[in-house]
């Protein structure tokens, strides 16, 4: 796996699923391929994106700044600086300085990532802030190692939280989660459907599913009534794809 592929993988792992994630993936691909060279426009676009947490925006801004060539005096962006200040915690800043000194001795991406993984996400973000604010310099490879370690720390905590939700025995939370998943699956089906005759069929199924979820929420239903909703939808989607000659069996 190439270095940039690895960076893209880690960064996208902390972006919530949805149309925005696809858009960010495209921007990252363009930046890494050298197709997008207007850093200012890119940062303005990033700043105004909804849904993303300030820290995720800060990390993306840091990656864009590392990758897109820019004039020496280009102004640093406040939204990135604020996100990478370790919540203003002096403890994070102390650790960030110690980490920075260690990173100065590293020359490889994997070496830097290994060193950085023993620090908390707050200290890692502060260290990125040091580099972003030009208070310290490391090679691009080492900076990318720091980025990936930070994303791994964040993705780990997100995964723990998702796992807690998936394994919860609370029937109301499970019910709501199934309805949310069914609704987002229906939305994805509508986006994929296109405009053929079979597409109308897929759109109809998706639309009915969304109406059903809406009705279930409006009148309040038994927590077990949502069981299998998403799977039924995915089966419909796969049947539609088969008719279109597309074989994708990996949605479940």
UniProtKB/Swiss-Prot annotation:
Instruction: Outline the segment boundaries, as ranges, of region: Membrane-binding.
Output: 1-164
* HAMAP family per record: INFV_M1 (MF_04068)
Biological process annotations from GO: viral budding from plasma membrane
Q: Where is this region: RNP-binding?
A: 165-252
Gene name in the database record: M
Q: What is this protein called?
A: Matrix protein 1
Q: What does this protein do?
A: Plays critical roles in virus replication, from virus entry and uncoating to assembly and budding of the virus particle. M1 binding to ribonucleocapsids (RNPs) in nucleus seems to inhibit viral transcription. Interaction of viral NEP with M1-RNP is thought to promote nuclear export of the complex, which is targeted to the virion assembly site at the apical plasma membrane in polarized epithelial cells. Interactions with NA and HA may bring M1, a non-raft-associated protein, into lipid rafts. Forms a continuous shell on the inner side of the lipid bilayer in virion, where it binds the RNP.
Cellular component (GO) terms are: host cell nucleus; membrane; virion membrane
Give the family per the record. Belongs to the influenza viruses Matrix protein M1 family.
Could you describe the subunit structure of this protein? Homodimer and homomultimer. Interacts with NEP. Binds ribonucleocapsid by both interacting with genomic RNA and NP protein. May interact with HA and NA. Cannot bind NP without genomic RNA.
Cellular compartments annotated: Virion membrane; Host nucleus
Q: Where is this motif: Nuclear localization signal?
A: 101-105
Q: Could you share any additional remarks the record makes about this protein?
A: Most abundant protein in virion. When expressed alone can form virus-like particles in transfected cells.
Molecular function (GO) terms for this protein are:
RNA binding; structural constituent of virion
């Amino acid at each position: 796996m190439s270095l940039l592929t690895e960076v893209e993988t880690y960064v996208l792992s902390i972006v919530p699923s949805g149309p925005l994630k696809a858009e960010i993936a495209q921007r990252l691909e363009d930046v890494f391929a050298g197709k997008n060279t207007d850093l200012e426009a890119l940062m303005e676009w990033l700043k105004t994106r909804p849904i993303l947490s300030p820290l995720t925006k800060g990390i993306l801004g840091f990656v864009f700044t590392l990758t897109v060539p820019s004039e020496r005096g280009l102004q640093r962006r406040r939204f990135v600086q604020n996100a990478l200040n370790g919540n203003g915690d002096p403890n994070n800043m102390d650790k960030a300085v110690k980490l920075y000194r260690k990173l100065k001795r590293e020359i490889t991406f994997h070496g830097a990532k290994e060193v950085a993984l023993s620090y908390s996400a707050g200290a890692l973000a502060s260290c990125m802030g040091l580099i972003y604010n030009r208070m310290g310099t490391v090679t691009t490879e080492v900076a990318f190692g720091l980025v990936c370690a930070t994303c791994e720390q964040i993705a780990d905590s997100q995964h723990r939280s998702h796992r807690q939700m998936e394994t919860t025995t609370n029937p109301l939370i499970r019910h709501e989660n199934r309805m949310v998943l069914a609704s987002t699956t229906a939305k994805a089906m509508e986006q994929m459907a296109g405009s053929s005759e079979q597409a109308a069929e897929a759109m109809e199924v998706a639309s009915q599913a969304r109406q059903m979820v809406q009705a279930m929420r409006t009148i309040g239903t038994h927590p077990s009534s949502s069981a299998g909703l998403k799977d039924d939808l995915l089966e419909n989607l796969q049947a539609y794809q088969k008719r279109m000659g597309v074989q994708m069996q990996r949605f479940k």
